[in-house]
Amino acid sequence: MGLCLAKRNHDADDDEPHIELAGGNVHLITTKERWDQKLSEASRDGKIVLANFSARWCGPCKQIAPYYIELSENYPSLMFLVIDVDELSDFSASWEIKATPTFFFLRDGQQVDKLVGANKPELHKKITAILDSLPPSDK
C-alpha cells in the first residue's frame, strides 16, 4: 500500500493534465458546486458515492488511478468521484485529508466507510462489503 502525505505547496511542474486521475465513469470534481450536484444526483438515484481525494504529484494516486477507473466501469451502481486536493484545498481540508489517496464511501451524503492509501485489495473488499449490505433493489 502506498500513500502521500498531504502538502500545501505544489511545484510549477505539477501542471500535468488530469488524465491519470479521471476517466471511464469517474467524475472529476473541480468545484464545490459540482460536488453538491453529484451528491444530490447520487442521493436521488440511490447510489453510494466513492470519493477519491487525490493529487497529481502523488505516485500512489497515479498508480491506483487506472484501477479506480476500472472499478468505475465494473460497478456502475456506484458513483465514482475524484477530487484534486490541490485544486480544492479548502474543501479537502474540511474533510481532514492528511494523506492521498483517501477514499470516502458516502450514502445520502454521509460517510459510511473510509480508506487511506492505494490498497487495491482493501478498496475492492470495501466496495464488495458495501454492495453486499445493500438491499437487492439498490445493487
From Swiss-Prot:
GO terms for cellular component: cytoplasm. The record marks G59, P60 as: Contributes to redox potential value. The keyword Transcription regulation does not apply. PROSITE patterns: THIOREDOXIN_1, THIOREDOXIN_2. The active site is at C58 (nucleophile), C61 (nucleophile). It is found in: Cytoplasm. Participates in various redox reactions through the reversible oxidation of the active center dithiol to a disulfide. The H form is known to activate a number of cytosolic enzymes. Disulfide bonds join C58-C61. Keywords: Cytoplasm, Disulfide bond, Electron transport, Redox-active center, Transport. Belongs to the thioredoxin family. Plant H-type subfamily. SUPFAM superfamilies: Thioredoxin-like (SSF52833). The keyword Disulfide bond applies. Residues 20-132 form the Thioredoxin domain. It comes from the Eukaryota. This is Thioredoxin H-type. InterPro entries: Thioredoxin-like_sf, Thioredoxin_CS, Thioredoxin_domain, Thioredoxin_H-type-like.
